[in-house]
């Protein structure tokens, strides 16, 4: 039996680590033990994350002890440090259905669950049985979640999925195609949630902001709802662009 890994700190350069390639260098706690970390903000793989150079918050990520997949009977137990790519590969190799929408969706499982990630009508909570926090397992029906958000205010260490057979390569290919129009450069992902009955990207384009740029930050010409960094974008440029689009 392998020896348990303790918590430790590591230095993270958020200009390299975050998907938008903006941010300071900070010491980050790597959590390998279940406990109370209410003083820390969990950041996952740094997707949809924009950190001010003046930020004084304490950050943490889940470590190696929470990167696992356990297949038991009709349930799948997955640690929240597990990447979406690793989980998708496992379900494909083991002919497990329902998670094909993870194709080309970046991030670790913890972040995907926190924001109820998905694509169009597919979302991760559709397939969840329960989640595990420091207080134990919580059934899905006792979690407050909705479109692209949850009200989970604690760390989720593990997710339990319902398991059914029948992985669909056709569905995986369809989800891959749906995301092929997304920018391939540094990005914070979708900037605004879709309002009911419409699409944020369409609205941004309708008011003439598709391709609008301040410095190296831009609302992408490929997909208007994506805030992209052409190389040397700054926190202030990103915030100014966001605020101008809201105004």
Report residues per predicted region.
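FAD-binding glycine-rich core of flavoenzymes that anchor FAD
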Residues: 34-42, 64-112
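Structural signature of FAD isoalloxazine-binding scaffolds in flavoprotein oxidoreductases
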Residues: 21-23, 27-32, 50-68, 114-141, ...
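A gly/ser-rich beta-alpha-beta helix-loop segment of oxidoreductase catalytic cores
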Residues: 98-129, 187
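Phosphate/pyrophosphate- and phosphate-bearing ligand-binding catalytic cores of soluble enzymes
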Residues: 15-19, 49, 134-243
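A short, hydrophobic C-terminal helix/tail in secreted or cell-surface proteins
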Residues: 246-247
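N-terminal, positively charged, Ser/Thr/Ala/Gly-biased leader segments
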Residues: 1-43, 48
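Active-site-proximal helix-loop elements at catalytic-domain edges
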Residues: 7-27, 59-80
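Short, well-ordered, mixed-charge alpha-helical segments that flank or form enzyme active sites
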Residues: 85-87, 108-116, 121-123, 138, ...
